[in-house]
Amino acid sequence: MKTLGEFIVEKQHEFSQATGELTALLSAIKLGAKIIHRDINKAGLVDILGASGAENAQGEVQQKLDLFANEKLKAALKARDIVAGIASEEEDEIVVFEGCEHAKYVVLMDPLDGSSNIDVNVSVGTIFSIYRRVTPVGTPVTEEDFLQPGNKQVAAGYVVYGSSTMLVYTTGCGVHAFTYDPSLGVFCLCQERMRFPEKGKTYSINEGNYIKFPNGVKKYIKFCQEEDSSTSRPYTSRYIGSLVADFHRNLLKGGIYLYPSTASHPKGKLRLLYECNPMAFLAEQAGGKASDGKERILDIIPESLHQRRSFFVGNRHMVDDVERFIREYPDA
């Protein structure tokens, strides 16, 4: 049995930018995940369920667990003195860690993805993304350090809190998964160099918004529902409502996750920096593809911390099909 810590140290030689700092940074995220796992499991017994009454930078009501997870991850990262600052979906602006100007890395995160599912005991997750800073080491980080395209990511990953808790990450050398053993308090390697199955047969989208979707996406959904034995259609529809959970299932079983623009969110709803970029990095490392329907997600130059984007991620052939339908059936 190989633990996450042992695996990270063992694989450092495969990563050209590997340093003890990056190893310690991943360990800090691991610690934060353990704390969140512990408290999610007893959320119904203590007062951390439901809405907090506050709103995040996008005007969305924050759940109590959103704030809890944000504070725990932030504390775990700051305590190691290896991160110069963070950007979070739950923070209006970047958080600069005083006394950590010497650190080389910044972290972007969605502390608790799908938190509205907590009250009904459905899987949720944590998403993280790591970059090398671009401003001089020894100075405080600025927003410039965080507004980097996804192709500059050093590492990215997610933790899914479900029937078991799993941490999945990449440093650009494949995607690896670890299951948390609460009796030992460690994450143990369960899958190395994960890949999307050759063919996907599942599509994940909130079809309740169908009437608001672009024409190309509507046509693609109909394509998924048509019978065609040569392409194994119709595909199966599966939608949990938690990006991490939907992505994880599709990574294991094969499929595509779609969150297009709508009339109410013309630029898309998912956050480019906290959700799209890290999941796109993982998808490509697992042989998949991620797009906004027209452009590779990892090539998009961010303009703001909380920028939103349409998002299509999963098996390469399925994302290719979505892009084709969007090209062939543009909105008037």
Curated annotation (Swiss-Prot):
Catalytic activity: beta-D-fructose 1,6-bisphosphate + H2O = beta-D-fructose 6-phosphate + phosphate
Cited SUPFAM superfamilies: Carbohydrate phosphatase
Annotated compartments: Cytoplasm
Lineage: Bacteria, Pseudomonadati, Pseudomonadota, Gammaproteobacteria, Enterobacterales
Top-level class of the enzyme under EC nomenclature: hydrolase
Name of the gene encoding the protein in the UniProt record: fbp
Alphabetic keyword roster: Carbohydrate metabolism, Cytoplasm, Hydrolase, Magnesium, Metal-binding
Matches recorded under HAMAP family: FBPase_class1
Cofactor descriptive note: Binds 2 magnesium ions per subunit.
Binding site for Mg(2+) 2: D110, D113, E275
Annotated positions binding Mg(2+) 1: E89, D110, L112
Recorded metabolic or biological pathway in which this protein acts: Carbohydrate biosynthesis; gluconeogenesis
NCBIfam families for this protein: PRK09293.1-1 (NF006778), PRK09293.1-3 (NF006779)
Disulphide-bonded residues: none
Name of the protein described by the UniProt record: Fructose-1,6-bisphosphatase class 1
InterPro entries reported in the protein's UniProt record: FBPase_C_dom, FBPase_class-1, FBPase_N, FBPtase, Fructose_bisphosphatase_AS
Assigned EC number: 3.1.3.11
Family the UniProt entry places it in: Belongs to the FBPase class 1 family.
One cellular component term from this protein's GO annotations in UniProt: cytosol
Subunit organization: Homotetramer.
Binding-site residues, substrate: D113, G114, S115, S116, N206, Y239, Y257, L258, Y259, K269
